[in-house]
């Protein structure tokens, strides 16, 4: 299981959503930490500009959660959770 590091902006943005949404995001991020294959490349100008070319994303409850993986899969890997954006804002 990878170590998770949450950015301040992610924590602040997530706090704006209701508890069921926050819980769904936490559950999805647990999957991300346990399974390296979860998520897709974050494509698009907004995503690349905001989170970097190497960012990945997962969709949950109408949100895109952006993150980056570093290190070899397993206990030496770190997942940096960068931000959460409503999908309607990206399209």
Feature-to-residue mapping (PLM):
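A short beta-strand-loop micro-motif that forms or neighbors metal/cofactor-
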Residues: 26-36, 73, 78
């Amino acid at each position: 299981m990878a170590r998770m590091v949450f950015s301040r902006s992610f924590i602040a943005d997530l706090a704006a959503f209701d508890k069921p949404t926050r819980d769904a995001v936490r559950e999805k991020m647990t999957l991300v930490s346990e399974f390296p294959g979860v998520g897709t490349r974050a494509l698009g100008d907004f995503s690349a500009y905001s989170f970097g070319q190497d960012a990945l994303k997962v969709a949950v409850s109408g949100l895109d959660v952006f993150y980056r993986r570093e290190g070899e899969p397993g206990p030496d890997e770190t997942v940096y959770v960068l931000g959460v954006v409503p999908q309607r804002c990206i399209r």
